């Protein structure tokens, strides 16, 4: 998917509200 410009190393993705999910410590939108 496309990177959402957010990392999820220490905290979860805030961008999950727009369909992003954590993959390999980076938030991606599938």
From Swiss-Prot:
Q: Which SUPFAM superfamilies match?
A: Cyclotides
Any Gene Ontology biological process: defense response
What is the location of the Cyclopeptide (Gly-Asp) cross-link?
A: 1-30
> What PTM annotation applies here?
Contains 3 disulfide bonds.
Query: What keywords is this UniProt entry annotated with?
Result: Disulfide bond, Knottin, Plant defense
Q: Name one Pfam family in it.
A: Cyclotide
Is the Disulfide bond keyword given for this protein?
yes
Name which cysteines form disulfide bonds.
Answer: 4-20, 8-22, 13-27
What is the stated purpose of this protein? Probably participates in a plant defense mechanism.
**How does the entry describe the domains?**
The presence of a 'disulfide through disulfide knot' structurally defines this protein as a knottin.
Homology family: Belongs to the cyclotide family. Bracelet subfamily.
Recorded protein name is Cyclotide cter-H
Instruction: Please tell me the species this chain comes from.
Output: Clitoria ternatea
Species lineage, top-down? Eukaryota, Viridiplantae, Streptophyta, Embryophyta, Tracheophyta
């Amino acid at each position: 998917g496309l990177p959402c410009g957010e990392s999820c190393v220490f905290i979860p993705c805030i961008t999950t509200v727009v369909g992003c999910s954590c993959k390999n410590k980076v938030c991606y939108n599938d």
